[in-house]
């Protein structure tokens, strides 16, 4: 693997990590620690639903202006890994 590819991987991983932290602060950690007012689904299941929605938008070409579905999917996958580490596969 080239040094450029290694650098790109590190740069993008850092950018996605910073985006996830910022959004998680803005949303009050709702992905990993939901308040469960209406939905009683586990954090893992809720994140999977959000991933389904993002992938559906990509497939159908119906993204919202300003959204970056690929970055959001990568972010949800990070949150999914965290939720599975904390709660298992519930």
Residue ranges and their predicted role:
Residues 1-90:
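Intrinsically disordered, low-complexity regulatory regions
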């Amino acid at each position: 693997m080239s040094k450029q590819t290694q650098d790109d991987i590190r740069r993008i991983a850092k950018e996605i990590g910073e985006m996830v932290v910022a959004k998680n602060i803005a949303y009050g950690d709702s992905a990993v620690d939901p308040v469960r007012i209406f939905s009683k689904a586990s954090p893992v299941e809720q994140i999977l639903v959000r991933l389904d929605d993002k992938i559906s938008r990509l497939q159908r070409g119906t993204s919202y202006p300003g959204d970056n579905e690929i970055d959001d999917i990568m972010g949800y996958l990070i949150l999914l890994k965290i939720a599975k580490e904390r709660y298992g596969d519930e």
